[in-house]
């Protein structure tokens, strides 16, 4: 039977590869963050080092991903807009995200749970649970060769994290060229067979 599996961070996590997070079942995922008023500050391939995925009966529907958000990894892209951050900046970025955002969640700090709840011809509904709030996010997907690739947009403020986001945005204002965008792009891919 074909293994049709996808999940995300998404959001999205495991050991490092050129694509970002990779789970033992070959699920790959990452997310893109934007800063600056014109979204010119772009940090791609962000992921997490620790996550657990599960694909019941090797199928995409009801596949889950449980993410330890304190394991954030922003090392794949050192872009700072006009140049590159030094490698030491990764620790600063990871700590800023962990300490000034994820640790400030009122419920389930350090945890994001993801589940594929519906699949259609070229789209799927992906359920995210963060800060005790559950939301279903639409994702588009396509098959390229033997790989299923999916993309979606997640607004972190939909999860009741306004205070945490305000803290994070204030701490990172100069790093993010004046603005931190609360909508992130989530990408994931998995073998289609």
Report the location of each language-model feature:
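Low-complexity, acidic/polar, glycine-enriched regions of mature
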Residues: 20-193
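C-terminal segment of classical bacterial N-terminal signal peptides
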Residues: 14-20
């Amino acid at each position: 039977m074909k293994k049709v599996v996808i999940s995300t961070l998404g959001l999205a996590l495991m050991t490092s590869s050129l694509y970002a997070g990779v789970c033992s079942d070959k699920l790959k995922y990452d997310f893109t963050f934007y800063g600056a008023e014109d979204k010119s500050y772009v940090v791609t391939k962000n992921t997490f080092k620790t996550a657990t995925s599960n694909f019941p009966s090797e199928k995409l529907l009801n596949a889950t991903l449980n993410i330890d958000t304190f394991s954030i990894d922003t090392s794949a892209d050192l872009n700072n807009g006009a140049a590159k951050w030094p490698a030491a900046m990764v620790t600063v970025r990871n700590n800023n995200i962990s300490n000034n955002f994820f640790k400030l969640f009122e419920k389930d700090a350090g945890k994001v749970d993801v589940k594929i709840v519906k699949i259609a011809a070229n789209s799927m509904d992906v359920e995210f649970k963060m800060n005790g709030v559950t939301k279903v996010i639409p994702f588009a997907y396509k098959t390229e060769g033997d790989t299923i690739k999916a993309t979606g947009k997640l607004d972190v403020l939909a999860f009741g994290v306004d205070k945490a986001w305000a803290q994070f945005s204030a701490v990172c204002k100069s790093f993010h060229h004046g603005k931190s965008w609360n909508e992130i792009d989530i990408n994931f891919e998995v073998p289609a067979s």
